[in-house]
Amino acid sequence: MANLNFQQPPRSIANAALAGRTTGGFGGSSLAGHVTPTSGMFQTDFANSYPGTANYGQAPQQQQQQQQQPQLSPNRNAQLSVGGPAISSGNRNANLFGQRQFVERRAMQGLGSGPMSNMGNFMQTGRGGYGTGGGGGGPLNNFHVFGGGGGSDTSTPALLDPTEFPSLTNARGQNDQTLPQSNPLQPPGSKPYGNFFTSFGMVKQPTSEQSEFTMSNEDFPALPGTQNSDGTTNAVGSVAGTGGSGGASTENHLDGTEKPMNSIVVSGSASGSSGSNVGVVGGNGLGAVGSGIGGLAVGGGGGAGSSGGGGVGGNAASGVVGGSHVGLVGSNSGIGGVNSVPNSNAMMGVGGGLGSGSGSSGSGAGGEHLNDNSSNDKLVKSGVQTSPDGKVTNIPATMVNNQFGMVGLLTFIRAAETDPNLVTLSLGTDLTGLGLNLNSQESLHTTFAGPFVAQPCRAQDVEFNVPPEYLINFAIRDKLTAPVLKKLQEDLLFFLFYTNIGDMMQLMAAAELHSREWRYHVEEKIWITRIPGIDQYEKNGTKERGTFYYFDAQSWKRLSKVFQIDPEKLDKCPNISAFMNGQSV
């Protein structure tokens, strides 16, 4: 128990009901006002001051042993003076509670009508003056009163907070069935201190703890996917058609099962005798004919007993559809309703999303709902597919379909992922080091040169599956005359140089550029030339410093820049005749 700071010198008790209970040394000592079971009110020599109570409640040997024991905690002293037998020891002179100013004390109301008058009823009489009859007086006469009668004093707040003493209030009450009764005088099932301290205004009434936060569909009704208490899921969507209107949707899972989804928003205009089906399942019909069950499913469709598509002349639906693998949001009311998507706009959403799609008009009656998600599979399987048995499918028409291209590399990598024996043989290829544009929206297999090349294929190196009738280069290359490079412009010469690496044409283009005063810098890897009309260059020995033209192959432009040219870093003109004779160039 915390320090209550209720100590004051003894004063005369004006209440005759309490004064009549005093015996022995307590007879002339009437205590009025706030009287607490603190030891500061007693003198140091309790037995000498009150001789009639020297052996009160225990033998002298027990009293002497009690004086030799160390000071008990406040909770222990309170238990000995309230719930246990009456113990009067010399250690009561210890001041457990600090001095409190008189102005802070509350005025005491009548003791006769307050809980103090009934103190003996719950203290269980018969233990040395604790009850109303007999016992020769005891600590009850010196019991300080904490509050007014019956807890009617509501102007002053409670002295203790139950959160600081959970064992005194609700926490103690929760364990009453499991914990044994610490005081044999307490009735079975009673709370030892809860009612006592509460009635005296010492603690606040325990408040019920709030439960943990839970979100229901009423809190966020506009959010799709809110879980209901019955296990269904809310979906926001609408099904509208000229021939009728109805709302339904189902949520497809990866295992092929479907879960009903509550349709919240259903809108549409009905013409003729078409009714409206709103519920877990339903759909629009052909007038009064095509109304059926099945709900709005992935890929669309509609008709009696099917997936609930649009009516005659009507467009299909917009809604939330959670599809298998990848959700296809948007459907159509195609003829027969067999997941055909003519003139429909579709959105991709993993696990379903919010979107809309419009389809062509047609009759949805007699349609058939397909749960194989064939339209989804086409969208999901957009790349090369490999099966466990080694079969490779879905190869693009422009891709080389042998083991030397990207298909062979992809097949080997995927096989190494499943076969532990091939892990050590798999290629540690860095995709970023192959010169591929990984951010490209187009397919990369057209310029993929292989895992052993650090740059993509050139335009003339791209291999295409062309008919053999067009492969005539090997037959006519020796019959063609040599190109006249002197008639070509400089940009075409640069194209021949950069696109025919390691070929005879590259040497011929380099020789022609050299004859046109272009020089190839072996360190800068660029072609440079002097700017016409500028003859002022700073010469330092054999080096020249000035502004030169250079050809930028990335931007394919001729730009100017200041260079310090060392003639030893410039490549010489290749000797074409020596190369033709098999000599070094």
From Swiss-Prot:
It holds the Pfam family NOT2_3_5_C. GO terms for biological process: female germ-line stem cell population maintenance; mRNA catabolic process; negative regulation of translation; nuclear-transcribed mRNA catabolic process, deadenylation-dependent decay; nuclear-transcribed mRNA poly(A) tail shortening; regulation of DNA-templated transcription; regulation of stem cell population maintenance; regulatory ncRNA-mediated gene silencing. Residues 58-71 have a biased composition (Low complexity). Residues 349-367 have a biased composition (Gly residues). Residues 42-56, 166-184, 372-388 have a biased composition (Polar residues). The keyword Transcription regulation applies. The keyword Transcription applies. InterPro entries: CCR4-NOT_su2/3/5_C_sf, Not2/3/5, NOT2/3/5_C. It is found in: Cytoplasm. GO terms for cellular component: CCR4-NOT complex; CCR4-NOT core complex; cytosol; nucleus; P-body. It comes from the Eukaryota. Expressed in heterogeneous levels between adjacent germline stem cells (at protein level). Residues 42-93, 148-191, 349-394 are annotated as: Disordered. Gene3D superfamilies: CCR4-NOT complex subunit 2/3/5, C-terminal domain. Keywords: Cytoplasm, RNA-mediated gene silencing, Transcription, Transcription regulation, Translation regulation. Component of the CCR4-NOT complex which is one of the major cellular mRNA deadenylases and is linked to various cellular processes including bulk mRNA degradation, miRNA-mediated repression, translational repression during translational initiation and general transcription regulation. Additional complex functions may be a consequence of its influence on mRNA expression. Essential for viability. Acts as a suppressor of position effect variegation (PEV) at the white locus and regulates the expression of several unrelated genes. Plays a role in germline stem cell differentiation in the ovaries. Component of the CCR4-NOT complex composed of at least Pop2/Caf1-55, Ccr4, Not1, Rga/Not2, and Not3. PANTHER family: CCR4 NOT-RELATED (PTHR23326). Belongs to the CNOT2/3/5 family. This is Regulator of gene activity. The lineage of its organism: Eukaryota, Metazoa, Ecdysozoa, Arthropoda, Hexapoda.
